[in-house]
Amino acid sequence: MDIRRIVLYMALALIGLSLWNAWQIDYPAKQPVEEKTASQLTSDGHLLPQIIPSNAEQPVTLKAEEKASSGKQLIQVKTDVLDVDIDLKNGDIVKGLLLDYPLSVEDKNKPFPLLQNQASQRYVANSSLFVLDGQTPQSLDFDFTSEKEYYELKPDQNQLIVTLNGKSEDGLDVKKEFVFTKGSYLIEVNYKIANTGNSLWKGYFNTQLLRSSPKEDKSSIFHIGSYTGASFSNPGKNRYQKVSFSDMSKSNLDVDAKGGWIAMQQHYFLSAWVPNADSENKFYTLATDKDYTIGAVSQPITVKPKEDKIVGSKLYIGPEITSVLKGISPSLDLTVDYGILWFLSSLLFSLMKAIYTVVGNWGWSIVLVTVLIKLAFYRLSATSYKSMASMRKLQPKLQALRERYGDDKAKISQATMELYKQEKVNPLGGCLPILIQIPVFIALYWVLLESVELRQAPFIFWINDLASADPYHVLPLIMGATMLIQQKLNPAPADPMQAKVMMFLPILFTGLFWNFPSGLVLYWIVNNTLSILQQWYITRKYSDEKPAKKVVATAK
């Protein structure tokens, strides 16, 4: 029995089962979305949290066709990394293009549209002020104006400020300010409120992210999905908490938080509202008419007559880059979902990034990190291979015991243990070194799957995107061949059924890896190749048929 191979494949099966179960938790069967009443929306389509009794009378919602026919006036803002459209109706960001991230390898000239406001796909970032008219939430309609329709951050500018001007019927003079910074995906959004009336103004600041009919990236046996949904952080209580779309359909989130953040996630990219660290907000979610929203509403804001006040938040629209997110808000970097071994994955990614700065290619970085990991575990692996070599030496004696005792399993087991003791062989000696390495393999697996740096990153020859499957499926075939070679280095199992299963495994894993990202398959190829070389060396070194022994035998 080849303990290393059996334990390794059992570990792989266990990993696969664990990943499948984890993704089933993240992506449960879709529940029918409950048709929520219009009491959750204002007349301009903004969703508002239930901060008042749910049976209170609410304004009527505009139908989709009425909103479409009302027309929108947009302004465009372009920086070196962002291209956004702002709707002057409420100052919402309704389009967000990421200029440094092409839509695909084939469409290099088309930037990735993270935010968009299309009939088939609506994903926008809202921010607004609202008041309570009795018990009715009423979003204030400022009908903002702008000096220009197009703003652009010039190469010699470090910052661009876009100001929208508006005024409410009750004498509230508002300037909505967007601050864009060179090279940054973070936008400061501020309301400068001036109460020009004669009475105290009391209202709320509301920020939200809304997606309609989102497509969830679900996992299957031949595809690795990534989390698509909402999340939030409540400092001191929940560092990072996912809220799936199915969770929103079942119940509304209602969390009081100081600081923290709310976000909408998808593979590689993220949008997030980050309130001021000392501000107190209520985080909420709503699902209605196939629209899924996560939002944050402030505590009551009061502005005395002739008084000015500034309220605001920060909006991130961009890639999930760990180092960038870590500098924006605590725990925001956890949206780069490395799983339960995130701390180990972070260390491995730092190592990969350091190598990348030297070699300038993420593919070679994967290769070299795999080599370093194998070197780090060389002695443990050697112990495993030595144990296997010792077990192979005992195979004839073990077979003789089986023939002697036939079907008497108790005597076979007793005699086998006595043989192990006599020969000073630990049958489990090869297991522990492998088990110790498994967490590292899992951590690196998630690094390769979740790191946006590998998206559209070329390697060599035809591999032009390490985050996508090999277009010609050459890498999966090579990986299957390396698994087959590993099997050939081991004696066939005594059990015929086990031998058939082991022969089928390379075919099975080739099929499983057929559409896996090239970076993942590359890692397994390098890992398998190094394992083959080490196993061949150790097995040859500790084989009974050593050159020295052959010389002695000849002399006799």
UniProtKB/Swiss-Prot annotation:
Ordered alphabetically, the record's keywords are: Cell inner membrane, Cell membrane, Chaperone, Membrane, Protein transport, Transmembrane, Transmembrane helix, Transport
Source lineage: Bacteria, Pseudomonadati, Pseudomonadota, Gammaproteobacteria, Legionellales
**PANTHER family in UniProt:** CYTOCHROME C OXIDASE ASSEMBLY PROTEIN COX18, MITOCHONDRIAL, OXA1
Role according to the record: Required for the insertion and/or proper folding and/or complex formation of integral membrane proteins into the membrane. Involved in integration of membrane proteins that insert both dependently and independently of the Sec translocase complex, as well as at least some lipoproteins. Aids folding of multispanning membrane proteins.
Name of this protein: Membrane protein insertase YidC
NCBIfam families to which the protein is assigned, alphabetical: PRK01318.1-3, yidC_nterm, yidC_oxa1_cterm
Look up keyword Zinc-finger and say if it applies: no
* GO BP term, pick one: protein insertion into membrane
- For this UniProt entry, which segments traverse the membrane? 6-26, 332-352, 358-378, 428-448, 501-521
Q: Write down the Pfam families for this protein, in alphabetical order.
A: 60KD_IMP, YidC_periplas
